[in-house]
């Protein structure tokens, strides 16, 4: 046991060194640029902009350390350090966005220090730095992925399942064959003794959506025998995780407040929605004009598409989107867009792929029908259909609907509604202003991921499809 813990700590230390290395290299590259270009007061062409950069040694270090801290913040939020946990391409997206965001923040800071907005035109050195850092990031990802594969070979796992088919879960695990290998599956019908004996033969176990009584027995057995265990959470588990711990004499208690956001949280969230909505409308106006022109030129139909959706407490409202389907696409009734939906126009495919079809919802945010972050709004009839299979689906209506959300960032467009509900409840139960800001940053990242914009599986019929 002692050796196992020491070995695990050694692995984590190696990965930590890799994290420190990439931050140090990126910071050193910026320091070279700072000393040799921006802080060089002898550059005659730039003297009038750099005459304010008279720093002593501590001043230089302040700029460089601040750069490192901002870089760490973006890398941490966007997942730039998560080699092995995320796919290589996801880590690369995160690194690119982190580097570009950090350099943009630093460049704005330099412009403020210089007290000259014309300074913003001298961007080529920082752009060059960004390109070099991206190249270094690619090399780092390849090297760290190789090291990770040696330190953490794929787990051979036992999967325990019940009435719900394990095929979808196995399919997801197989997509990360570098981390997980389901070597054996066993049904609850095999009996408790047989399953416990099989668990003892593995280093890792994954427990599917099975009754709580049996699941708890497996969890206790794994805990007692130091066996790594993964468990598909139930809706009640998500509530338990977010509960507050209180001590009443010698008896620990969990407190479930179940009251939604506090007044302070609601006020801050609304203020942030208004600020981001105003900035977003102004910044996105050229793009929205181009999209409107493209839609109009394609078939001459209406540019916008409005539809009734429901938000907090089931209140109906009109949501606005750029029209991505043919005119009268729902004359045969409401249905979700499928992966190969023939109703989607060529222009619609492009704007859906880029997630810009939802830009008009910035006005819904300003009006107050929606928030910038929250569960995506559904139609009343779709919600009722899901509630037949999942009575708890209405739990999503405890907060305002959102333009982006936890389920959009961590799920996929074709994630089954039951799993989307779990993701949305994770957001609702763990809400904070910091979580909102994190999800907004991560939304920028998913704009470039195809699986986030595909339709539902053509064969999906129910909210619990798992075959």
Task: Please provide the spans of the model-predicted regions.
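Signature of alpha-helical transmembrane segments in polytopic membrane proteins
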Residues: 1-149
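N-terminal hydrophobic signal-anchor/signal peptide
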Residues: 1-29, 142-285, 454-455, 459-467
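C-terminal terminal-structure detector
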Residues: 4-5, 394-467
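Membrane-cytosol interface motif
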Residues: 95, 99, 154-169, 302-325
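Loop-to-transmembrane-helix entry motif
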Residues: 95-99, 103, 271-279, 354
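Short, glycine-rich, amphipathic interfacial segments at transmembrane boundaries or analogous
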Residues: 236-237, 305-343, 404-422
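A hydrophobic, helix-centered structural microdomain
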Residues: 265-328, 364, 439-467
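A short, structured surface patch at a secondary-structure boundary
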Residues: 339-400, 439-443
């Amino acid at each position: 046991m002692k050796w196992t813990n020491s070995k695990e700590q050694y692995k984590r230390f190696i990965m930590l060194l890799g994290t420190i290395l990439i931050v140090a290299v990126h910071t050193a590259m910026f320091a070279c640029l700072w000393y040799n270009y921006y802080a060089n007061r002898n550059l005659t062409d730039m003297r009038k902009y750099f005459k304010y950069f008279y720093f002593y040694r501590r001043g230089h270090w302040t700029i460089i350390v601040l750069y490192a801290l901002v870089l760490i913040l973006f890398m941490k939020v966007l997942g730039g350090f998560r080699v092995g946990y995320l796919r290589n391409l996801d880590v690369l997206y995160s690194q690119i966005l982190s580097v570009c965001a950090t350099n943009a923040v630093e460049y704005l800071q330099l412009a403020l220090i210089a007290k000259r907005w014309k300074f913003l035109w001298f961007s080529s050195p920082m752009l060059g730095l960004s390109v070099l850092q991206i190249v270094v990031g690619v090399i780092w990802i390849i090297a760290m992925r190789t090291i990770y594969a040696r330190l953490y070979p794929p787990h051979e796992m036992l999967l325990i399942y019940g009435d719900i088919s394990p095929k979808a879960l196995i399919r997801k695990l197989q997509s990360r064959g570098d981390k997980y290998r389901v070597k054996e599956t066993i049904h609850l019908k095999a009996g408790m003794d047989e399953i416990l004996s099989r668990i003892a033969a593995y280093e890792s176990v994954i427990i599917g959506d099975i009754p709580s009584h049996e699941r708890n027995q497996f969890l206790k057995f794994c805990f007692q025998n130091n066996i790594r265990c993964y468990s598909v959470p139930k809706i009640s588990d998500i509530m338990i995780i977010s509960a507050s711990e209180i001590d009443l004499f010698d008896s620990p208690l969990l407190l479930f407040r179940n009251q939604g956001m506090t007044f302070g949280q609601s006020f801050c969230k609304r203020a942030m929605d208004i600020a981001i909505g105003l900035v977003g409308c102004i910044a996105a106006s050229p793009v929205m004009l181009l999209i409107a022109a493209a839609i109009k030129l394609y078939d001459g139909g209406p540019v916008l598409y409005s539809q009734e959706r429901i938000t907090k407490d089931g209140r109906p409202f009109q949501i606005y989107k750029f029209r991505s389907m043919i005119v009268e696409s729902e004359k045969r009734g409401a249905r979700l867009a499928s992966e190969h939906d023939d109703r989607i126009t060529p222009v619609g495919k492009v704007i859906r792929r880029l997630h810009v079809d939802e830009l008009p919802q910035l006005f819904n945010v300003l009006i107050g029908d929606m928030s910038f972050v929250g569960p995506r709004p559904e139609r009343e009839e779709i919600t009722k259909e899901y509630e037949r299979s999942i009575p708890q689906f209405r739990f999503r209506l405890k907060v305002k609907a959102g333009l982006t959300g936890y389920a959009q960032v961590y799920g996929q467009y074709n994630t089954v509604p039951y799993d989307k509900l779990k993701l949305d409840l994770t957001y609702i139960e763990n809400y904070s202003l910091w979580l909102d800001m994190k999800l907004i940053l991560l939304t920028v990242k998913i704009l470039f991921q195809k699986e986030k914009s595909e339709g539902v599986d053509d064969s999906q019929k129910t909210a619990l499809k798992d075959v």
